[in-house]
């Protein structure tokens, strides 16, 4: 997870 627009 990377806050805004991120994916992990």
UniProtKB/Swiss-Prot annotation:
Further information: On the 2D-gel the determined MW of this unknown protein is: 15 kDa.
Protein name: Unknown protein 3 from 2D-PAGE
Organism, as annotated: Fructilactobacillus sanfranciscensis (Lactobacillus sanfranciscensis)
């Amino acid at each position: 997870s990377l806050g805004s627009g991120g994916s992990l």
